[in-house]
Amino acid sequence: MYLCSMIDVEICCNSIASAVAAKDGCADRIELCRDLECGGLTPSEEDIAYCVHHLGLRTHVLIRPRPGNFCYTEAEQMEMIATIKRCKELGAKAVVLGFLTEEGKIDVEITRRMVQLASPMEVTFHRAFDEALQDPIEALWDVAASRCHRLLTSGQRPSALEGAEVIKSLIGVTGVEILAGAGVTPMNVRELVEKTGVREVHGSCKKSLDDGTFVTDAASVRQMIDKTLTL
């Protein structure tokens, strides 16, 4: 049975084990990826299908074919298009992506094309926004012009709490929902929400394993959700 929170909590999951832990912690929405150690890459089709159909989670799928910058070649874009189409077929709720131009600005043209291809799935523009060489409000308007439903951001700072002032300034400017993420934990989520006014938060609630990788911790997920119940 899921807990009912006025704050929509999204858990970043890098594997099936993490997705199971997120569900055990009463989450019902995840961002699914792999290789979180390098910032996250596109997960496998098998993992997407399992999370959607077996776990019954609202699954937002990261579309990122490689580590590094967010300026993609035509071949990489074609790969991303194929993945987006497959996510739609598999029943994903949303895809998560981001494109920058060679000048470091939001690539409105390519992003809008991907949003159109993804429909009726929602599209979240990810933290490529935080690397954009633009004023955050200007960049937000570009995200809006791309027709994205949501923006995942730390306010162009290393953590969402550090970027709280910028995050607050983004809310309500356009119709884009602001999802605060980066360094969000059960210990600081209340402070973040109170400082910014966001209604959506993103965290991994992860613990380190002996091999240097990470996995979602169900107890931390439950604590995160508990902390948001009275906000």
Write out the residue ranges for each language-model feature.
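N-terminal pre-domain/capping segments
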Residues: 6-30, 35-42
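A structural motif
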Residues: 27, 56, 91-92, 120, ...
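Long hydrophobic alpha-helical segments typical of transmembrane helices together
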Residues: 191-231
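Active-site-adjacent beta->alpha loops and helix N-cap segments on the catalytic face
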Residues: 17, 36-57, 74-79, 99-119, ...
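Catalytic cores of alpha/beta
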Residues: 14-24, 68-86, 130-146, 167-180, ...
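Ordered, amphipathic secondary-structure segments that act as subunit-interaction surfaces
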Residues: 82-99, 103-106
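Hydrophobic faces of well-ordered beta-strands that scaffold small-molecule active sites
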Residues: 7-11, 30-32, 59-63, 95-97, ...
